[in-house]
Regions:
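Gram-negative bacterial Sec-dependent N-terminal signal peptides
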Residues: 2-22
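Hinge/lid segment of periplasmic solute-binding proteins
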Residues: 25-62, 129-189
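Short, polar/charged alpha-helical segment
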Residues: 51-59, 76-94, 195
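Extracytoplasmic "Venus flytrap"/periplasmic binding protein-like
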Residues: 63, 87-164, 200, 205
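Ligand/substrate-recognition segments at binding pockets and active sites
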Residues: 67-84, 104
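Short, well-ordered beta-strand segments
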Residues: 69-71, 125, 182
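Solvent-exposed loop/turn segments at secondary-structure junctions
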Residues: 75-78, 104-107, 129-133, 186-189, ...
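Helix-loop-helix "hinge/cap" segment bordering the ligand-binding cleft or interdomain interface
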Residues: 91, 98-100, 145-151, 172-214
Length: 214
């Protein structure tokens, strides 16, 4: 049993060292040339951004950070993040990303438990923006506005422009601070019968009732 334990420990150490050894600009270039196209950024701009991630990861590893754990509900967008982007981040930075995919109800339950206990079982949570009220009232969720501009500035991608994100109003609390960074959203589509809007009898009834044209 003692020998087996040592073997497992050695294998784990090899895995961690292996990720660090593979990580770097060559891996970043591979992902830029393949998965990260097309892009609004040029490949040189993408590489400059990847270099920032690589250097930031080295600082985090020096502080003992080897893995980042994230959880989200199981939908196609998050499956891509868990299976593809997590792999890209790991290969480029050497820091492993463990992205759990579970049911939406389980995400809410685990989040609620973590907030009540004051101990988070994940480093990052992807939750619906309609929980913004809960996040604000509990006072347990990191205020991203202050963090990214203060204590977390060193770990915040300098290329981020919050104006590029759609829906930040829905992730901002009553205090004007942002508690969630929009990740994806469901588009609302409204369908209507165009022919009904063209019927004279309906137009006449509408104007008679409301005083203006349909």
């Amino acid at each position: 049993m003692k020998v087996q334990f040592k073997a497992i420990a050695f294998a784990a150490a090899t895995l961690v060292l292996g990720h660090a050894a593979w990580a770097g600009e060559a891996e970043a270039k591979k992902w830029i040339d393949s998965e990260f196209q097309p892009s609004t950024l040029s490949k040189d701009q993408q590489m400059a951004e990847m270099k920032w991630f690589i250097e930031a990861a080295k600082k985090l590893q020096a502080k003992g950070v080897k893995e980042i754990s994230v959880v989200s509900e199981t939908i196609t967008t998050h499956e891509y993040e868990a299976k593809t982007l997590a792999k890209a981040f790991t290969e480029i930075t050497g820091i492993t990303v463990k992205h759990d995919l579970i049911q939406e109800g389980d995400v809410v339950e685990k989040l609620q438990t973590s907030m009540q206990s004051g101990k988070s079982i994940y480093d990052g949570w992807i939750s619906d923006s309609d929980l913004i009220g809960t996040h604000y009232r509990y006072g347990k969720i990191l205020n991203l506005t202050d963090y990214m501009g203060g204590a977390g500035k060193e770990w915040t991608n300098p290329g981020i422009d919050i104006k590029d994100y759609i829906g930040t109003k829905f992730t901002t609390g009553p205090d004007g601070k942002m508690y969630q960074l929009p990740d994806q959203q469901f588009a609302n589509l409204y369908w209507f019968r165009a022919d009904l809007f063209e019927r004279k009898d309906i137009k006449d009834k509408f104007k008679a009732k409301y005083g203006y044209d349909l």
